[in-house]
Amino acid sequence: MAESPIVNHPEQGLCRDCLSLQKTQTSRRCHACGSPRLIRHKELYRLSLAHVDCDAFYASVEKRDNPDLRDKPLIVGGGKRGVVSTACYLARIHGVRSAMPMFKALEACPDAVVIKPNMEKYARVGREVRQMMRDLTPLVEPISIDEAFLDLSGTERLHKAPPAVVLARFSKRVENEIGITASIGLSYCKYLAKVASDLEKPRGFSVIGEAEALDFLRDKPVGMIWGVGKAFAAKLESDGIRTIGQLQTMEEGALMKAYGTMGQRLYRLSRGQDSRKVEPDHDMKSVSAETTFNTDLSAAGDLVPVLRALSEKVSRRLKAGEIAGRTIVLKLKTQDFKLRTRNRQLGDPTQLADRIFRTGLQLLEKEMDGTRFRLLGIGVSDLSPSDRADPPDLVDIQATKRAVAESAIDRLRNKFGLNAVETGYTFSKGNLARTQTPTDRDNEP
């Protein structure tokens, strides 16, 4: 549990604009500046675990850099054959969503402006936001380029303010100095901090306290459980489980018998129990990506393109973080929810999609015995700085050529978008590799 034990503040509110503490509980506006942007919660000054998520990050950066786009629906993504990377909130009103095929997005919002992603620029802005987070606490755990968990417990004396006030200051600083907005979720555990940050986007600041957790979760759909994608939610619904409240009435043993290790997660998170600590990025143990399929798959022609797409996703994160890993880990879940993990250690650390994929493929081929799989994942562990990664292969000249080609592809994708270049593995099965992903989790412990 992440709470601030130092000061018992009598005030129950905070103004997000002037940052004054609110002593009255009935006023709808700040007593100091008149702003309606007030936060009130009984545990506001005790909680210290936060999830920070920049709002429509890619689109917000583009609108910041081009004021002419401010009042226009904006989609960041590939061409007509590509997919949406992100969309501004004006476009979302029309039904545009991330990962939507571009032609469908333009059907939903024909007046949208489409911009190809500039990953170098987004990474640069992401690093600026990350540094501001580290100014608050050393306990920053990045989840992606634009979001992270922060543990501010024990920082009240340093900042001379409780974590809620420090986070509100941070939000204003990001808006004023970087020119984009962020939403904040404050709670006592990672799971509910993440849930809270999604409640009032954009420019949100939501709080979920420990005392209210069970009641808050009771009527929520099972899809709100971290790690429950569309396919698994459909499975639970077919078993008669639609709400988190139903999970709260079930025994842990029964859930584990029905759903394996995922049953334990369902039991604990449905009760707001999440003991995971915030782990700083320099202690990150692995980088991974996984997908749960709409339909259980067994054929190589279906599995291999997805493995390639996931390998490229892991590779992008390694390169963005300037890290590499020495152990490749393959993760499979069978149709009866049994988990298989296989790993292989490399001679040198890697961040190349080609090496990750080819090693993962060797592991996957040994498991393709007709078994149908509902989940496929690939990851890299034993992480280290990338300065010693992927030395030239003096034996396998083709591997060196593939590494050079991958570097060229990276430059093209950074300039023109992720779908500017596709490999032979993903091109013919592109729709499967890109859209068969109702559950897509990264770095799950």
Swiss-Prot record:
EC category: transferase
Family statement: Belongs to the DNA polymerase type-Y family.
Cofactor requirements of the protein: Mg(2+)
MF annotations from Gene Ontology: damaged DNA binding; DNA-directed DNA polymerase activity; magnesium ion binding
Cofactor binding: number and manner: Binds 2 magnesium ions per subunit.
Sorted UniProt keywords: Cytoplasm, DNA damage, DNA repair, DNA replication, DNA-binding, DNA-directed DNA polymerase, Magnesium, Metal-binding, Mutator protein, Nucleotidyltransferase, Transferase
Assigned EC number: 2.7.7.7
HAMAP family: DNApol_IV
Function comment: Poorly processive, error-prone DNA polymerase involved in untargeted mutagenesis. Copies undamaged DNA at stalled replication forks, which arise in vivo from mismatched or misaligned primer ends. These misaligned primers can be extended by PolIV. Exhibits no 3'-5' exonuclease (proofreading) activity. May be involved in translesional synthesis, in conjunction with the beta clamp from PolIII.
Name of the protein this chain belongs to: DNA polymerase IV
Taxonomic lineage from the root: Bacteria, Pseudomonadati, Pseudomonadota, Alphaproteobacteria, Hyphomicrobiales
Reactions mediated catalytically: DNA(n) + a 2'-deoxyribonucleoside 5'-triphosphate = DNA(n+1) + diphosphate
Entries under SUPFAM superfamilies matching the protein: DNA/RNA polymerases, Lesion bypass DNA polymerase (Y-family), little finger domain
Gene: dinB
Binding site for Mg(2+): D53, D146
Cross-referenced PANTHER family: DNA POLYMERASE KAPPA, DNA REPAIR POLYMERASE UMUC / TRANSFERASE FAMILY MEMBER
Record site feature (Substrate discrimination), residues: Y58
GO biological process: DNA-templated DNA replication; error-prone translesion synthesis; SOS response
Gene Ontology CC annotations of this record: cytosol
Quaternary context: Monomer.
Cellular compartments annotated: Cytoplasm
Gene3D superfamilies: 3.30.70.270, 3.40.1170.60, 5' to 3' exonuclease, C-terminal subdomain, DNA polymerase, Y-family, little finger domain
UmuC domain ranges (all copies): 49-229
